[in-house]
Swiss-Prot record:
PANTHER family: L-AMINO ACID N-ACETYLTRANSFERASE, MYCOTHIOL ACETYLTRANSFERASE. GO terms for biological process: mycothiol biosynthetic process. It comes from Nocardia farcinica (strain IFM 10152). InterPro entries: Acyl_CoA_acyltransferase, GNAT_dom, MshD_Acetyltransferase, Mycothiol_AcTrfase. Residues 4-141, 154-303 form the N-acetyltransferase domain. This is Mycothiol acetyltransferase. 1D-myo-inositol 2-(L-cysteinylamino)-2-deoxy-alpha-D-glucopyranoside binds at residues 38, 181, 223, 234, 272. NCBIfam families: mycothiol_MshD. It catalyses: 1D-myo-inositol 2-(L-cysteinylamino)-2-deoxy-alpha-D-glucopyranoside + acetyl-CoA = mycothiol + CoA + H(+).
Length: 303
C-alpha cells in the first residue's frame, strides 16, 4: 500500500497550492460535488487563519484538509479531499482524525454531499451530525417567477463600487453574527471576491430606504457558475439588517436576483441554507426551490 504521511503548514507555496487545486478539481469531477468550500479554495493563495494539512502517499500529494481554527463562539471547521486514484487506503480517515484533533473541542468537519465514503469515515471515527446545510435548486423557466414589485419607501439598486463596501459589511456582519463562515467579514473578504472572474456589480442588489438612501437595509449577491454545463446561477448571499426585518426585504431582494439571472439566459439557480433555518427554508420553498443535496458537518460524540 505504501507509506502515508501527513504534515501541517500555515502557508502553501505556489507549486503546492496548484497541486492542491488539481486534486480538488479531480475530486469534484469524480464525485459530482466540490469537496471543499469557496472559502477554502480562496485560502490556498491567501495568507490567513486557515491551516493546511497535506497527505502524501509514496511521496506524492494524495489528500488535503483545510482547517479554520475556532474563533469567538464558533468551533474549528475542517474540510477534506482525497485524490480519486488514491482512495481506499485510509487517507480520508487519517486526514479527518488529524484535523479534528488539531481543531480542539467541538471541532467539525464538512462532508459536502455527504457521500457514502464520508459516511463511512464518520462511522469509523464515531462522529455525530452537528450541522446540516441544504443546497436547494429551482428552474428559472418553470414555475413562473412572481412579479417583482418594489414597495413605496424602498429603493432597489445595484452595487456602485467600493463606496458601498462599508454598508455592505455592516449589514453582512449584523445579519450573520451567528454564522461561522459568513459572519465577521472584513474589507479583504469583499475585495477578494470582487477580483474573482465571476464578480458582476450588476448582480449585487442593495435595498435602501428613501428617507435614508445612504443606509443599506439589505442586499442580495448573485453569482454565476460558468464552469457548469449548462451554467447555473446562485443566490450567493442574502443579508438583511436585523433592524429592517419584517419588511419583506428578503423576498424582494431574492426575487430581484432571480429575475436578473433569468434575464442573463440561465436555466437554473441554486442556493445554500441551514437546514434548521425554518424561516429561510419556507421563503425559498414558496419561491419554488426544493432540496437538491445536503452537506453535513460531523463532530466527535460528546463534543
Amino acid at each position: 500500500m505504501g507509506d502515508i504521511t501527513v504534515r501541517w503548514t500555515q502557508r502553501l507555496d505556489g507549486e503546492t497550492a496548484d497541486a492542491v487545486r488539481e486534486l480538488l478539481a479531480a475530486a469534484s469531477a469524480a464525485d459530482g460535488v466540490a469537496p471543499v468550500s469557496e472559502q477554502a479554495v480562496l485560502s490556498l493563495g491567501e495568507p490567513g487563519a486557515a491551516r493546511h494539512l497535506l497527505a502524501e502517499h509514496d511521496g506524492e500529494l494524495a489528500g488535503y484538509a483545510n482547517l479554520v481554527p475556532a474563533h469567538g463562539d464558533h468551533p474549528a471547521m475542517a474540510e477534506a479531499a482525497v485524490a480519486p486514484a488514491r482512495r481506499g487506503r485510509g487517507i480520508g480517515t487519517a486526514l479527518v482524525r488529524e484535523a479534528l484533533a488539531a481543531g480542539g473541542a467541538d471541532a467539525r468537519v464538512w462532508a459536502h454531499g455527504d457521500r457514502p465514503a464520508a459516511k463511512a469515515v464518520a462511522a469509523r471515527l464515531g462522529l455525530r451530525t452537528a450541522r446540516e446545510l441544504w443546497q436547494m435548486r429551482r428552474s428559472l423557466a418553470t414555475p413562473q417567477l412572481p412579479e417583482l414589485v418594489v414597495p413605496d419607501g424602498i429603493v432597489l439598486r445595484t452595487y456602485a463600487g467600493p463606496a458601498d463596501d462599508a454598508e455592505l459589511l455592516r449589514v453582512n456582519n449584523a445579519a450573520f453574527d451567528w454564522h461561522p463562515e459568513q459572519g465577521g467579514w472584513t474589507q479583504r473578504d469583499i475585495a477578494v471576491r470582487r477580483a474573482e472572474s465571476w464578480f458582476d456589480p450588476a448582480g449585487l442588489f442593495l435595498a435602501t430606504d428613501t428617507a435614508a438612501p445612504d443606509r443599506v437595509l439589505g442586499f442580495h449577491w448573485t453569482k454565476v457558475h460558468a464552469d457548469e454545463q449548462p451554467p447555473v446561477g446562485e443566490v450567493y448571499v442574502v443579508g438583511i439588517d436585523p433592524a429592517a426585518q419584517g419588511r419583506g426585504l428578503g423576498r424582494l431582494l431574492t426575487l430581484a436576483g432571480l429575475h436578473h439571472l433569468r434575464e442573463r439566459g440561465l436555466g437554473g439557480v441554486l442556493l445554500y441554507t441551514e437546514a434548521d433555518n425554518t424561516a429561510a427554508v419556507n421563503t425559498y420553498t414558496k419561491l419554488g426551490f426544493a432540496p437538491a443535496h445536503v452537506d453535513v458537518a460531523y463532530a466527535a460524540n460528546g463534543a
